[in-house]
Amino acid sequence: MLLNGEDGSMTIKINHVKEYEALVEIYKKEGLDTSLFGNRIAAIIISGDKIIGLNSVPGVKIRGEEVENGVKADIEIADNVKLPFPIHLCTGYLRSEGYQKVIFNIKIGKNSIVKFTSHCIFPYAKDFSHEALTSIKVGENSWVSYEDEHIHGEGVRMISKTEIELNKNARYTGKFSLTKHRAKELKLEMIANLGERSVLELESKVKAVKDDSVEVREVAYLKGAYSRANLKSTVIAFDEARANVVNEAYGFGDYAKGHVECHEIVKGNADVQTVPLLRVKNDKAELTHEASIGRINEAQLMQLMAKGLTDEEATELIIRGLLGEY
C-alpha cells in the first residue's frame, strides 16, 4: 500500500517508513541536506530493491519499477522547465551484505535547466556489490548538472556506468565524489557524445586508502561542430591502494575543443597509473592535456610549513584543497 498525501506530499510506502527515516538520519549525521526529502522536491528514494519514496513535480515525471535485486526508474523532464530545486536521487542499502542494481533512464527536453543531486548511501556495507547504469539524454539548449556523492562502509564493490548524449547547444556538468569514505573496489565509467555547440564538463574526485582498488574512465566524443569538453580527474592514493585513471577525448567535429586534466597524488606504497588518450580525426579540431602524478608539490609544502604548519598538517591541507574539502 502507498501513502500519497492529497496535498502533493512525498509518496512513502507505509511498510518502509522506518527505512525512510533511517536514511534521513544518515543524511543528518553526514551533514547532507535533509531538505531534499521535502514535498517540493522531485525525488525517488530507494532502499535495497524497494522504492520507499517517490515524488513528481510539474514538468518532471518519475516512474519507478522494482526489479530483481534493485530498481529501474524513468525520469522525464518536459520542454521549457526551469526547476528552482534539484531533483533528488537517493539510492540506499542499509544491510551489510548483498547485491543491488539500479537503472536510471533520464531524458531532458528542450530549453530546460535542471540539477540532479544524487546520493548513494551504503554506510554499513561489509560485503556488498552495487551496480549502477545511467542513461542521460539532454535536449537542445538545455543545461543539466548532476552531482553524485557517496557514503560507503568498509566493504563496497561498485560498478557505475553513465552514458550521456548532448544535442545541439546542450550543456552537461557531471561531478562524482567519493572522498570521505572508503572506495574499496570502484569502477567508474562516464562516456559522452557531443552534438553541435554542446558543452561537457566531467569531474571525478576519489580518495583511495588501505588496499582500495580504483578504476576511473572518462570519455568524450566531440562529434558536433564547435563542441567543447573538459575532463578532470583527481585521485589521492594512500597506503597500498591501487588506481588506474584513463581520460579519452576524440575530436571529430569542425572546431571541436577538448581538454583533459589529471591530478594524482601518491602517498605510502600506493600504485597509481594515468593514461591520457587524445585522438583527432579532423584537422580543425583541437585537444590538449595536462597531468601531474606522484608526490605532493614540494614548493607548496614548504610554503605552508613556513607559516607554522607541520609536514602532516600541510599535506592534509593540500589534499583537502585538491578534493574541494574546506
UniProtKB/Swiss-Prot annotation:
Family that this chain belongs to: Belongs to the iron-sulfur cluster assembly SufBD family.
Protein name: Iron-sulfur cluster assembly SufBD family protein PH0883
InterPro entries found in the cross-reference section: Fe-S_cluster_assembly_SufBD, SUF_FeS_clus_asmbl_SufBD_core, SUF_FeS_clus_asmbl_SufBD_sf
GO biological process terms, semicolon-separated: iron-sulfur cluster assembly
